[in-house]
Amino acid sequence: MRIDLQKVAEKLLLVLFLSSSLFFVLEIALRAYSYELAGMIIFTAMFCAGMVALAFVSAKLEKTVSIPVAALLIFFLYAASVSMFFNSIVLSLFLLSFPFAWLRFVEKKTFNESLQLLMATRKGFLWNALLGFCLTLFLFYPIMFLEVVILKLVGITDVSNVSEIIRKAPLWLAVFSFTVAPVAEEFFFRGFLLPRIGIVASAVLFGLAHYAYSSVAEFLGAFTIGLLLGILLLRTRNIVSVIVAHITFNLISILIIYLGSWFG
């Protein structure tokens, strides 16, 4: 029996979108629960909304989607209770799947049309991958290094916040940050947002998304790399180039941090 890989990918992305969305609804509800009466009301409302949404999914979609959604949601909730870092994983899965869900349900696009709109194509794959790797290694990273030097000269030195968080994080999160996370972020910020709100606005949002480290240097760094990746995507019209560039950038950064902690 021949397996339709596009159908499998489409269903997998739908499962990821629904389960990650429901996870954050319930996560916010649980956080609100601690805020006395108002929090309990919000918790009840959001919990009920999440359960209604899950029931809707079960009723409207076939079992090949609804059952995995419920199972994955339970796993997400359990994993998040075990590790405080797991929310980052679910967020990346949401960012990856959201563009496809939006294009399917709001803009009524087929999966192939969605891939084209997100500039995901196999044409020139190796060339774009090599371009993204080389540009990051010989242009983007030197630019970012120069930016860090300038920031230190003007008194912005909180870049160490990021290094400390990464050192304390489990190894699997570091691996995730240069494998899955760059793919998710490029599909969302460059493939989906950039054509809709422009290169500068998408770079600002990309920077704000990295401000969770409470680091001005990290925000400015993410904003700059967001601009560089945006320019690269507009030139190549192929998301492979920016995904590989982002993977390369994150991998180099993590290696520098770990090598610094081992030999520093």
What is each PLM-predicted segment?
Residues 2-17, 37-42, 60-77, 109-142:
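Interfacial transmembrane-helix boundary/kink motif in multi-pass membrane proteins
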Residues 30-38, 110-181, 263-264:
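Juxtamembrane helix-loop-helix connectors linking adjacent transmembrane helices
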